[in-house]
């Protein structure tokens, strides 16, 4: 691609920690623009749920639905059970460079923990 990409996996829309993660990111999108990176949020929610959530919370990053869970499984970030829902995405962050190589990968210990966004920004700064 022409840009570095930050891929953020999150378990479910309309949950508190996910909202904090992506709203913080939406507010900080200018920082990622300066680092020449596109930010994409991925969850196993339907695109309709994601759209409703994005509008309600004014989330300005690209959201991608992984309803069939193939991307979540390909990145090996499956969380077995959350709020009665099986096989959601774990909370995770990846930085993928312009050549498609993963330069940073982090899966948080629990869905309540946020990824280390400073580490993500540090990796992006080196990739300029």
Over which residues does each language-model region extend?
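Chalcogenol-based redox active-site neighborhoods
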Residues: 1-128
């Amino acid at each position: 691609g022409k840009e570095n990409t930050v891929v953020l996996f999150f378990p479910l829309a309309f949950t508190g920690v996910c909202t904090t993660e992506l709203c913080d990111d939406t507010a900080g999108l200018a920082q990622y623009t300066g680092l020449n990176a596109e930010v994409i949020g991925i969850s196993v929610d339907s695109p309709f749920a994601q759209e409703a959530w994005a509008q309600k919370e004014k989330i300005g990053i690209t959201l991608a639905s992984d309803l069939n869970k193939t991307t979540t499984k390909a990145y090996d970030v499956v969380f077995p059970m959350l709020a009665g829902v099986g096989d959601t995405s774990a909370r995770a962050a990846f930085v993928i460079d312009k050549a498609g190589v993963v330069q940073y990968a982090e899966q948080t210990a629990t869905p309540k923990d946020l990824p280390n966004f400073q580490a993500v920004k540090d990796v992006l700064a080196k990739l300029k």
